[in-house]
């Protein structure tokens, strides 16, 4: 795949690379299945315990990096063609407009293909009970029939929110597998929760 932001995994031994056309996706170590971890994350001003905090790295990216540290997978960061503001209130207002319009925000760096992946992990924050609308843009762009899609979310109050329902609608023919929801304020201490979930969905062995 040329011109695609893909990494083998998040780890100290891996740098961001762009596989050449025809390169096969990385096999997962435990299941033998090929796994794509696609995530959207927003740094900047974020909600935290009823207040605000400025994050250099968004919570969903922290969670994606944690997952990528435990399994072999290809990782794709979804970038908005029109980047979201670092300002919390501005992002909230934009998200409300996008939800009300059932918008599909453009992606700056779409993958050329998701062929070859058997398991897809879709990671994002939950905004107003739903994954950001750009996740629907991504999910609807590809044919996930016959694949297993696992929602992965960071949240303030809503857990997985409507992510399972939305991905079921966006990914016809896919199996929506067990999701993982981690409170944003606690994501940096979620190692045990992440490992337990990866074992349950059989991507990590004891």
Locate each region found by the language model:
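N-terminal export leaders
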Residues: 1-2, 6
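N-terminal beta1-alpha1-beta2 submodule of the flavodoxin-like/Rossmannoid cofactor-binding fold
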Residues: 8-117, 129, 199-205
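Solvent-exposed loop/turn segments at secondary-structure junctions
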Residues: 42-45, 80-85, 126-130, 155-160, ...
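Helix-loop-strand module that forms the ligand-binding subsite of alpha/beta enzymes
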Residues: 88-172
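Glycine-rich phosphate/pyrophosphate-binding loop and the adjoining helix
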Residues: 175-206
């Amino acid at each position: 795949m040329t011109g695609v932001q893909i990494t083998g995994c998040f780890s100290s031994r891996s740098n961001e690379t762009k596989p050449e056309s025809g390169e096969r996706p990385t096999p997962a170590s435990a299941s033998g299945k090929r796994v794509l971890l696609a995530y959207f994350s927003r740094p900047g001003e974020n909600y935290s315990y009823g207040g605000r905090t400025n994050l250099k790295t968004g919570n969903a990216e922290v969670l994606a990096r944690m997952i990528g540290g435990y399994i072999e997978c290809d990782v794709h960061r979804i970038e908005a063609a029109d980047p979201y503001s670092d300002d919390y209130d501005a992002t909230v207002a934009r998200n409300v407009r996008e939800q009300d319009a059932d918008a599909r925000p453009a992606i700056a760096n779409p993958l050329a293909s998701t062929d070859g992946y058997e398991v897809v992990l879709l990671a994002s924050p939950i905004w107003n009970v739903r994954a950001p609308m750009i996740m629907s843009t991504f999910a609807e762009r590809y044919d996930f029939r016959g694949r297993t899609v696992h929602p992965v979310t960071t949240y303030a109050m809503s857990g997985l929110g409507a992510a399972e329902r939305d991905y079921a609608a966006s990914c016809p023919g896919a199996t929506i597998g067990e999701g993982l929801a981690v409170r944003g304020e606690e994501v940096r201490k979620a190692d045990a929760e992440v490992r337990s979930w990866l074992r349950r969905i059989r991507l990590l062995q004891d």
